[in-house]
Amino acid sequence: TGDLIRLVIKQTIETAKDVYTRTGIAKNPVSVVSLAYRELRDLNIKNDARILIVGAGETNTNLAKYLQKHKFANFVVFNRTESKAQKLAAELKGTAFQLNELANYKEGFDVLITCTSSETPIITKDIYTSLLNGEKGKKVIIDLAVPNDIDRNLVHEFDIKLIAVESLKEQAQQNMVKRGHELEACQEIIEMHIGEFKSIVKERN
């Protein structure tokens, strides 16, 4: 029985490896967080970039931990409830502030990630100008909120690379379709491995 279990595990691992290497099933992320990270990665943002996080909910937490996993380490977290900001900041080894302190933050940033439940834009022209604190150069904003957290007019008035939730969701839907096209190839590989497994078991008996 022990040998059979080991054989099952081995065959399962080989099947999974084949599926991932011989098909494109893993090449097209379908989560907004994964897609947001990929867009940021493709911008060649340095690991010491100053990352400002507005909102400490699940989406921002997941993206922040994704960034931390990929060696980003300079985080500042703002949230309406300070305790939640402190919790996420502690996990990221960053700094926490209440959301109402955002307008007074003068330490600058390179990447702004925002996702709150606000019904109106939080990042207004006045707030954004204050956050820049005179800094020049392109900034990256990842707005994952619905409705949006940033005033979209900012994109026309400032040097901003915007990664918006709408485009990420559209990409996720396209990737879901692409994954669907790969399922037939995956099924063929799985069936092939099942056949091999049955032959091996039959020989052992």
Question: What is the predicted function of each stretch?
Answer:
Residues 1-47:
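Glycine/serine-rich phosphate-binding loop and adjoining beta1-alpha1 elements at the start
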Residues 29-33, 37-68, 72, 76-80:
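Glycine-rich adenosine-cofactor-binding loop
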Residues 42, 129-140, 144-205:
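Adenosine-phosphate binding glycine-rich loop
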Residues 71, 91-92, 156-158:
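Short, structured coil segments at secondary-structure junctions
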Residues 80-81, 101:
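Short beta->alpha hinge that forms the Motif I/post-I loop of the SAM-binding pocket
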Residues 82-83, 146:
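Helix N-cap at the beta1-alpha1 junction of Rossmann-like dinucleotide-binding domains, i.e.
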Residues 86-87, 107-109, 170-177:
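Short, charged, surface-exposed secondary-structure boundary motifs
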Residues 95-97, 102-127, 133, 137-142, ...:
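Rossmann-like NAD(P)-binding element
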